[in-house]
Amino acid sequence: MIIDFKKYSSVRIGNEFEVLVLDQICDFDGFLIGGANNLLVSPKPKNIGILGDGFNFIQILDRNKDFIHLRIGCKTKSSKMYRFAKENNLKGFEYLSKIPGTLGGLLKMNAGLKGECISQNLIKIATSQGEILRANINFDYRFCPLNTHFFWAEFKLNFGFDTLKDEALKNARSNQPSGASFGSIFKNPKNDFAGRLIEAVGLKGFSKGDAMLSDKHANFLINKKNASFEDAFFLIELARKKVFEEFGTNLENEVIII
């Protein structure tokens, strides 16, 4: 299938490329995309694949009075997982109301919010290399060590959807800028914030072409209208360079560049 990444990706940057649809668990020599919410696509990306619709599902494997055991396809959107948890009175997915993307992408970056993350209720992941138990995966902050493709995952959730947490999360990320963006450019370094460092070196609101380091939150890159890959990449590398020169801190990408 052909995907126009200027329309498909959240930052609205990219060209049209042929994307291979994977309808079953298999090896694939390339990059597997999800919702393209934290993705910047270059003019010459490597092979791109996407999961077929057969991996968009939530299946109940077991349930009792205390918990429910789910298998979820990695093309399933976070919003669908959140709604399922809320409708079935399940605890542990409340934060997904504020994190866009598909399950595969969430697992790849161990996505989370307010001290919670997608790996916390995980049992195992089905990959192109076989099924891998959570106990054998060394997740860390915004990090998953597995360099393979994900197809479905299983979770164990307790009952008791947290309505207070859900309400509190409604104001989470209210400081984030609007507009076409891939979210945070960099991971926060330990005991600091990437946005603070970028602002401290004078780059908050700095533009190159139609790409801008947001004047509301410096760790966000905004496509004002028709930003190019080159403009966006220039700003990312400029911010990294300036912060390292000033503070000796090497900012690590949260955005994935292919």
From Swiss-Prot:
Catalytic center residues: 142, 184, 254
Pathway: Cell wall biogenesis; peptidoglycan biosynthesis
Protein name: UDP-N-acetylenolpyruvoylglucosamine reductase
Family per similarity comment: Belongs to the MurB family.
Cofactor: FAD
UniProt entry tagged with the keyword Lipoprotein: no
Organism ancestry: Bacteria, Pseudomonadati, Campylobacterota, Epsilonproteobacteria, Campylobacterales
EC number(s) recorded for this UniProt protein: 1.3.1.98
Catalytic activities: UDP-N-acetyl-alpha-D-muramate + NADP(+) = UDP-N-acetyl-3-O-(1-carboxyvinyl)-alpha-D-glucosamine + NADPH + H(+)
Entry-linked HAMAP family: MurB (MF_00037)
InterPro entries registered for this protein in UniProt: FAD-bd_PCMH-like_sf, FAD-bd_PCMH_sub2, MurB, MurB_C, MurB_C_sf
Purpose: Cell wall formation.
UniProtKB keywords: Cell cycle, Cell division, Cell shape, Cell wall biogenesis/degradation, Cytoplasm, FAD, Flavoprotein, NADP, Oxidoreductase, Peptidoglycan synthesis
UniProt-listed PANTHER family: UDP-N-ACETYLENOLPYRUVOYLGLUCOSAMINE REDUCTASE
One Pfam family cited in the UniProt record for this chain: MurB_C
An example Gene Ontology CC term for this record: cytosol
Subcellular location: Cytoplasm
Encoding gene (name): murB
GO process terms (BP): cell division; cell wall organization; peptidoglycan biosynthetic process; regulation of cell shape
An annotated Gene Ontology molecular function: flavin adenine dinucleotide binding
